Amino acid sequence: MKKTLILLIKGYRRLISPLFPPSCRFQPTCSQYTLEAIEKFGALRGSWLGLRRILRCHPFHPGGYDPVPPVTKK
């Protein structure tokens, strides 16, 4: 599942993203953030973090630097 999601995001970045002007308000971009989150936290939690980030990426949010949170050990 994790590899499939990563492949889909990389495909989006390579094939679809270049067709549109850059519009992400964050650094790193939402697709890069989601890739890092999936690699760091796995498919389920990484996808959730990526979805939350994408939902915040709109004109009414200031954006800025928003890195993937660190892994916390319990």
From Swiss-Prot:
Top-level taxonomic group: Bacteria
Function (record text): Could be involved in insertion of integral membrane proteins into the membrane.
Keywords: Cell inner membrane, Cell membrane, Membrane
Designated name of the protein: Putative membrane protein insertion efficiency factor
PANTHER family referenced in this protein's UniProt entry, alphabetically: MEMBRANE PROTEIN INSERTION EFFICIENCY FACTOR-RELATED
InterPro entries: Membr_insert_effic_factor_YidD
UniProt topology in membrane: Peripheral membrane protein
Organism: Crocosphaera subtropica (strain ATCC 51142 / BH68)
Protein localization: Cell inner membrane
SMART domains: Haemolytic
N-terminal signal peptide: none
Membership in a protein family: Belongs to the UPF0161 family.
The UniProt record lists the keyword Thylakoid: no
One Gene Ontology cellular component annotation held by this UniProt entry: plasma membrane
